[in-house]
Amino acid sequence: MAADTGGLTATGGPAATEDRTTVRIDHLVRTLGGRRVLDDLELAIAPGEFVTLLGHSGSGKSTLLRAIARLDHDVTGSGELTAPDDVSVVFQDARLLPWKRLLDNVVLGLSGPDAEARGRTALAEVGLEGRERAWPVELSGGEQQRVSLARSLVREPQLLLADEPFGALDALTRIRMHTLLRQLCERHRPAVLLVTHDVDEAIALADRVAILEEGRIAVDIPVELPPPRRHGTPQYAALRDRLLARLGVEATR
């Protein structure tokens, strides 16, 4: 599939992975209200790779995710953006349909005789086995995000985009969700681009951490820390300090 909107060329399908990249972005420009939100941005994500994206508010993180997901066709832009057609998106708000039970939320849009079985398996994977008939209102915020993850991964996407998916959760629930998300991604192996404001979250989850500044990728470094990634290790502290310094935040112990 190919589309050209305002000078931005987007391609998808099998060609997206011919060069062993799931996402490839070259010289991407996005203009909103006369301001260049993304300015000559370049980024590549390999199959199964987990990339976290940091940056100040207004740096263009959500704009980048929307561009990759092709959710903003009316925005002026240019450059090359290659991504697969089968993309799932997880938002900070779980966005469950309140009038549908959990299983119905998960299998929404799925087809085939095994759709319900796949939905049940997906709910079991996120620790909600036996809750298929529950209503979204009966769940905590963390449980609702578990359903959102199940709904995204039941489709076995090549690419998972996540826009601050745990931003509204308490600290303990966030830690539990980090563990769950890593386990799910290791099992399903999508490429992942996750936006966050939390440096510790970025380090905990990522194979690579990138920082977006003034519409460009200013930092893109691998996270070469073995699990579990503990705050007290010198390697963790050095990486955390480096990222915080680039973001203009003084490190605290």
Short names for language-model regions:
Residues 54-56:
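The feature captures the beta-strand-to-loop junction immediately N-terminal to the Walker
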Residues 135-139, 143:
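Conserved ABC ATPase signature
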